[in-house]
UniProtKB/Swiss-Prot annotation:
Its cofactor is Mg(2+). SUPFAM superfamilies: Phosphoenolpyruvate/pyruvate domain. Homodecamer; pentamer of dimers. Mg(2+) binds at D45, D84, E114. Its EC number is 2.1.2.11. It is found in: Cytoplasm. It comes from Shewanella denitrificans (strain OS217 / ATCC BAA-1090 / DSM 15013). It holds the Pfam family Pantoate_transf. GO terms for cellular component: cytoplasm. This is 3-methyl-2-oxobutanoate hydroxymethyltransferase.
Amino acid sequence: MSKVTSSTLLKFKQEGTKFTSITAYDASFAAAFDSEGIDAILVGDSLGMVLQGHDDTLPVTTADVAYHTACVRRGISRALLIADMPFMSYATPEQAMTNATTLMQAGANMVKLEGGHWLLETVTMLTQRGIPVCGHLGLTPQSVHVFGGFKMQGKDEKNAQRILDEALALQDAGAQLLVLECIPAALAKTITQAVAIPVIGIGAGADTDGQILVMHDVLGITSGYIPKFSKNYLKQTGEIRSAIKAYIDEVAAGDFPSEEHTLV
């Protein structure tokens, strides 16, 4: 199978082909996901919670993400590899440039940043210097203390309009991909139709161009709170590779997320 690039995902959007993403943090799981046909793998700062045991993602460092990015890179040959930029690793454009370079040199094809209008200069700077950017709007976990917890965003008209405006602005600044997290499905659909770049949803309904889940949720090994938008595919299939295949197939068919896994 040919390598997935940002152009591949753009073609999927234009053709109406749903694509599937997942988090991974090591070579073995990444290789299994890659061989089953996952289109994009995110080395998420979620590693702070699912691997390191923290209550949120804030303690994660660029060195942490770079280490796991290098591990995942060794396990894959097809999927697009996206690396999260951790909390306070991109507070200024110059800081972002330094840390994004570290992640790209570790093997990432793209870096992901959380935020809207304040990030536009940084997105343009990175893009112009050869570092592809994925934006992230809605529930941005690095801002959990500003939000007062892991809460759905964009529920009122003012904030919904702000998220839409920021999506368009990120696209204009050069972002090639966008993640929407924990926003109303109707808003996610509006944004997906409004932008030309591919949109990946998590807790954002079924009308985004692609979906992403944390691997620990897909495999049913998450401890504590389990998000409504997640689904334990291992319980359904009994085998890891079959679980990933079921996830891919359900997204492609439009069966996931179902109403059961959609936030209102």
